[in-house]
Every structure is written in C-alpha cells, then in structure tokens.
Amino acid sequence: MKQLYGVIGNPIGHSLSPLMHNDAFEHLGIDAHYHAFLVEEEMLGEAVKGLKALGVSGINVTTPHKVAIMKYLDEIDPLAKQIGAVNTVVHRNGKLVGYNTDGIGYVRSLQAISKEPLRHKRMLLLGAGGACRAIYCSLVAAGVKEIDIANRTVETAKQLIASSKERVVSKALSLEKATEAQENYDVLIQTTTIGMHPHVQHTPMQIGSLKQGAIVSDIIYNPFETKFLHDAKLSGAIVQNGIDMFVYQGALAFEMWTGMMPDINRMKQLVIRKLGG
C-alpha cells in the first residue's frame, strides 16, 4: 500500500517540498507520495485529527502552523520543545511525534562547508526570531561554545540567550556593535527576512573587514545571492545561501520517516533548477 506524506501550511502552493520528496521516493524505489495540503489556521486541529485517522505516515509543517500544531501532537522531541516549534511530524505506533529539523538541518549544512569542527568556531547570529532560535538551540546542542546574537531589539536577543540552559558563552549585541566587531567572528549567520525578494537592496548589516576564511551564511534563497552575501563575497568570505538549509532539513525529515538518507546533492540541484538557477 502506498504511503502518504505531506506538508501543511498556508499559503502552500509555492512549496518545493513535494518536488524534492517525490523525486527522492522515486530515486530510492519507495512506494510513497508527498502532497501539499492547504490548511487554514482555524482548521488545524481538525486537519491533524484527519491526517492521523487516514494513516498519513509523516508531515512537514510550515508557516503559520509550526507553533500552533504542538498542542495537537502526542509527543514532542526535547529539542523541538526547547525551540518552541515543530516542522516535522512522524506517525509512529499510533502516535504523532513532533520534531524540529530546521536547526539541525542548518547545522549539518554549515558543517558541510566548514573545514573544521563547528565547536571550535566563534559565531554571530543576526536576528532573534523563530529561525534564529532554531539555529541557536541546535548550534548549542552541537557543542558550539561561543555564539553571540545581534538584533535591532537587544532585549529580544537577551531573552533568547537566557532561555538556553546549556553552558555557552553568548552576548546580545546591537547591530551597530556587531558591525564594529564582525572581524572577530569565524561564522556570521543572517536569520532574518531582510534582503528577501522583492527588497533585494536591503541588508541587515554593512559588511566591512572580515576574518580570513570567515563563513557568511544567509537563510534566504530568493534571491540566490542577497546583498549581504554579495558584499561578504567581495570581502573574501566563503558564502552560503538558504538552499542548503532547506534541503538538509528536508533530508533529515525524509530520513526520520523512511530510515533512508536521500541524495543531498540530487535534492539540491533539483531545487536550484526549479528556482531557475
């Protein structure tokens, strides 16, 4: 019997997840289908009950349901609980179990382009929203010891840092202070929507002098190269856009559902082609 997987969100028509997962199922010879489900916020509880009743094997969760879905699940993974959001649900032994692969996926994508273990690197995160929280918690879980957070509202960054119970050296900075100190960091990670299409000339921070060999990463992938990444490249940085994070979080969800890891590069090239790259 064909297994059914999917993604729920609103809007959902733009989602690249069905393309990516259905290709992986076919490539690995798995008899399954992945479908995009448009779910209105007020219908989320009913949708989750329906997915469970129909025996859907697993789902991804996207905007605006990542937080709201948690109250409808049977169990939540500790890291997802700490992040405060779920993006992947596994239907296991009659229970719906929630996970968050956004942050872990990002960490794996970052490690893939780093020549050294991430725990040896000093990092700066820009932003303090949901994406930043997922990445921050996952970096801490991966053993990174120095992670500062810069945000327009410094108090929000302080609250995020205070929520972590792990031993990690973190400071909350203004964007102005972060701009002055950017040369001190091995990795700069842009987690906001600043610079996303159509506001492609915007940047959260002016890039100046960077540490030699610095990695500069932006979770945005539309455009492929934000002004932030463009300026970082001109300053000699190794740059990474948001496609890697998107692909790795999807691949981790796929592995949780099937026990098989899909071809990461195949997934990435498929997404790039679809986006016109």
From Swiss-Prot:
Keywords: Amino-acid biosynthesis, Aromatic amino acid biosynthesis, NADP, Oxidoreductase. Pfam families: SDH_C, Shikimate_DH, Shikimate_dh_N. Pathway: Metabolic intermediate biosynthesis; chorismate biosynthesis; chorismate from D-erythrose 4-phosphate and phosphoenolpyruvate: step 4/7. The lineage of its organism: Bacteria, Bacillati, Bacillota, Bacilli, Bacillales. It is an enzyme of class 1 (oxidoreductase). One of its GO terms (molecular function) is shikimate 3-dehydrogenase (NADP+) activity. This is Shikimate dehydrogenase (NADP(+)). CDD domains: NAD_bind_Shikimate_DH. Shikimate binds at S15, L16, S17, T62, N87, D102, Y221. NADP(+) binds at G127, A128, G129, G130, A131, I219, G242. The active site is at K66 (proton acceptor). It comes from Bacillus cytotoxicus (strain DSM 22905 / CIP 110041 / 391-98 / NVH 391-98).
